[in-house]
From Swiss-Prot:
It comes from Pan troglodytes (Chimpanzee). It is a lipid-anchor; GPI-anchor. This is Glypican-3. Disulfide bonds join C35-C72, C65-C262, C73-C265, C197-C349, C252-C285, C274-C422, C278-C410. Residues 555-580 form a propeptide. The modification Pyrrolidone carboxylic acid is found at Q25.
Length: 580
C-alpha cells in the first residue's frame, strides 16, 4: 500500500513540475500544433472557421505573412487581417484627432452663431434709433436696414457681395425717404417721382458727407477679417476630416498586417510588436501625412496673428454695434446742410421748390430706448475677443499634431516598449534591432521607396488649401501697432478711444451719443461649451487586437497563485509519505 502511495505521489509531482515551469523559462509557448488558439482568435474577426486550417499548413500561397515553417494562416485569413489592420489604423487616427476636431467644430459653431447674434443686435439698435428719432422714416428705413444686415450676414458666410455696394445701396435707398419725409415733409404727390434722381444726387453731391466712406472702411475691414476667420476654422475641420479617413496604400496595409497579425499565424498570441519596429512602420505609412505638419504649424500661427489684430475697425462686434451711431451722424449731417441741398437738388432734379424749407423737429440730445439697447455688462472673459484668444491658446497645444502622429499611434497600440521579447514582423526576438528589421523587410517592402512616393493626392490637395488660407490669413493680418496708425485715425477714430483692453473699444463719433459696449454674453445665448467626452465618436471602441490580447492575456493566467500553493502542498504531503 505504501509503495502504491509513493508511486502515485511521484507521478503527481512529475505532472505538477511539468504544469508549472520555472520563472526563468521563456513565456511564449511553442506554435499551436493544432491551430486551436488561432481558430479561436480568428473567429472574433470573421464568424465561421472555414478559412482556418485545423493543423499547420505549408502556407505557400501567403503573400504577406511569409512562413519560415508550417503556419496556421490561409490566404483568405491574410486578406481579412489586412482589412482589419486598415480599420485599426483609421480608428487610431480618429482617436488621435478626437479632441482637436471637436475643439475646432465647437468653436466654428460658436463663432458663427455669435456673429449672427451681433448682426441681429446691430440691426435692432439701428431700427431703434430710427424709431425713436425719425419715426417719419419708418417703415421704409426698417426695410432698408433689414436688407443691409441680411447682406452683412451673407457676406460673413462667404457670399460674393461687395461691401461698398451694400453701403451705397443703404444710403441710396435712405436719401429719397429722408428728402421727402424729413427735409421736405408735405411735398406734393406730383413731386414724389424723383427717387432715381435723388439716388444719383446722393453720390454726386455727397449729401451724407464722408460718413458712407467711413462706414465702408469700417464694415469692409471688419467683415473681411471675420469671414477669413470663419473660413480658416472650417478648413481646419476639413483637414482633420481628410486625415481621419485616409485610404492607406497597399504596401502600408501589408506592413500593418505583418506588425499586428502575422504573429498569430505562428501561434504567438501573446507577443506584442516591438516598439522600435512600430515606429519604423508608422514612419513609412505616414510619411505623406507628416508633410502636412509644416503647413499646419503655419496655419495656427497665421490664425493667431489674425486674431491678435481683430479689434477696433478690424472687429465686427465693435463696428456693427456702433453702426447706428454713425448712421445717425450721417443723417444729422444732411439736416445741417438741408438748405443748400434742397436748393441744389431742386435745380438738379428739375423740381421747383415753391415752399420754404421746413425741417422736422429734431432734439439736441439723442434719445434711445435704453430698454431696447440694453447690453449686459459682462466680464472680460465672456467677450468675443477673449473667446478667440482662448481658442488660439488651445490650438497652439496641437501645433505639432501631425509630426507627432506616428508616435501617438504606436503609444496607443499594443507594443513592447522596451523592445525585448517582441515581434519584429518576422519572428519573436529577444531584443529588437532596427537594422536587422529593415534588412528583413527589404525583400517585402522598400520603406525608402514608400516614403519617396510622396503624399496621396487627397493629402496634396489639402496641403494646397492650407497654403491658400495661410496666404489669405497673412494678407488680412494687421501688423502690430497698425490699428493705432495715423491713417486709421483720419478715418474717424481718435487714438485715445481704446485702452489696453480692446474689448472696451467702441464705435460712433456723435457728440452726446450713448456709447454701447461691444460685450455680448455667450453663456446666455450659446450652449456649445460641451465636454470632450460628449463629442460624437468620443467613446472609442477597443481595437480587435486590444480585445484579443486582453482576452488571451486572461486565458494565459491559468497558473494562479492559489493553484501554485496547492501544488506545493501536494508536494509536501508526497514528500512526507516518501520519507516515511
Amino acid at each position: 500500500m505504501a509503495g502504491t502511495v509513493r508511486t502515485a505521489c511521484l507521478v503527481v509531482a512529475m505532472l505538477l513540475s511539468l504544469d508549472f515551469p520555472g520563472q526563468a523559462q521563456p513565456p511564449p509557448p511553442p506554435p499551436d500544433a493544432t491551430c486551436h488558439q488561432v481558430r479561436s482568435f480568428f473567429q472574433r474577426l470573421q464568424p465561421g472557421l472555414k478559412w482556418v486550417p485545423e493543423t499547420p499548413v505549408p502556407g505557400s500561397d501567403l503573400q504577406v505573412c511569409l512562413p519560415k515553417g508550417p503556419t496556421c494562416c490561409s490566404r483568405k485569413m491574410e486578406e481579412k487581417y489586412q482589412l482589419t489592420a486598415r480599420l485599426n489604423m483609421e480608428q487610431l487616427l480618429q482617436s488621435a484627432s478626437k479632441e482637436l476636431k471637436f475643439l475646432i467644430i465647437q468653436n466654428a459653431a460658436v463663432f458663427q452663431e455669435a456673429f449672427e447674434i451681433v448682426v441681429r443686435h446691430a440691426k435692432n439698435y439701428t431700427n431703434a434709433m430710427f424709431k425713436n428719432n425719425y419715426p417719419s422714416l419708418t417703415p421704409q428705413a426698417f426695410e432698408f436696414v433689414g436688407e443691409f444686415f441680411t447682406d452683412v450676414s451673407l457676406y460673413i458666410l462667404g457670399s460674393d457681395i461687395n461691401v461698398d455696394d451694400m453701403v451705397n445701396e443703404l444710403f441710396d435707398s435712405l436719401f429719397p425717404v429722408i428728402y421727402t419725409q424729413l427735409m421736405n415733409p408735405g411735398l406734393p404727390d406730383s413731386a414724389l417721382d424723383i427717387n432715381e434722381c435723388l439716388r444719383g444726387a446722393r453720390r454726386d453731391l455727397k449729401v451724407f458727407g464722408n460718413f458712407p466712406k467711413l462706414i465702408m472702411t469700417q464694415v469692409s475691414k471688419s467683415l473681411q477679417v471675420t469671414r477669413i476667420f470663419l473660413q480658416a476654422l472650417n478648413l481646419g475641420i476639413e483637414v482633420i476630416n481628410t486625415t481621419d479617413h485616409l485610404k492607406f496604400s497597399k504596401d502600408c496595409g501589408r506592413m500593418l498586417t505583418r506588425m499586428w497579425y502575422c504573429s498569430y499565424c505562428q501561434g504567438l498570441m501573446m507577443v506584442k510588436p516591438c516598439g522600435g519596429y512600430c515606429n519604423v512602420v508608422m514612419q513609412g505609412c505616414m510619411a505623406g501625412v507628416v508633410e502636412i505638419d509644416k503647413y499646419w504649424r503655419e496655419y495656427i500661427l497665421s490664425l493667431e496673428e489674425l486674431v491678435n489684430g481683430m479689434y477696433r475697425i478690424y472687429d465686427m462686434e465693435n463696428v456693427l454695434l456702433g453702426l447706428f451711431s454713425t448712421i445717425h451722424d450721417s443723417i444729422q449731417y444732411v439736416q445741417k446742410n438741408a438748405g443748400k441741398l434742397t436748393t441744389t437738388i431742386g435745380k438738379l432734379c428739375a423740381h421747383s421748390q415753391q415752399r420754404q424749407y421746413r425741417s422736422a423737429y429734431y432734439p439736441e440730445d439723442l434719445f434711445i430706448d435704453k430698454k431696447v439697447l440694453k447690453v449686459a455688462r459682462v466680464e472680460h472673459e465672456e467677450t468675443l475677443s477673449s473667446r478667440r484668444r482662448e481658442l488660439i491658446q488651445k490650438l497652439k497645444s496641437f501645433i505639432s499634431f501631425y509630426s507627432a502622429l506616428p508616435g501617438y499611434i504606436c503609444s496607443h497600440s499594443p507594443v513592447a516598449e522596451n523592445d525585448t521579447l517582441c515581434w519584429n514582423g518576422q519572428e519573436l526576438v529577444e531584443r529588437y534591432s532596427q537594422k536587422a528589421a529593415r534588412n528583413g523587410m527589404k525583400n517585402q517592402f522598400n520603406l525608402h521607396e514608400l516614403k519617396m512616393k510622396g503624399p496621396e493626392p487627397v493629402v496634396s490637395q489639402i496641403i494646397d488649401k492650407l497654403k491658400h488660407i495661410n496666404q489669405l490669413l497673412r494678407t488680412m493680418s494687421v501688423p502690430k501697432g497698425r490699428v493705432l496708425d495715423k491713417n486709421l485715425d483720419e478715418e474717424g477714430f481718435e487714438s485715445g478711444d481704446c485702452g489696453d483692453d480692446e474689448d472696451e473699444c467702441i464705435g460712433g463719433s456723435g457728440d452726446g451719443m450713448m456709447k454701447v459696449k461691444n460685450q455680448l454674453r455667450f453663456l446666455a445665448e450659446l450652449a456649445y461649451d460641451l465636454d470632450v467626452d460628449d463629442a460624437p465618436g468620443s467613446n472609442q471602441q477597443a481595437t480587435p487586437k486590444d480585445n484579443e490580447i486582453s482576452t488571451f492575456h486572461n486565458l494565459g493566467n491559468v497558473h494562479s497563485p492559489l493553484k501554485l500553493l496547492t501544488s506545493m502542498a501536494i508536494s509536501v504531503v508526497c514528500f512526507f509519505f516518501l520519507v516515511h
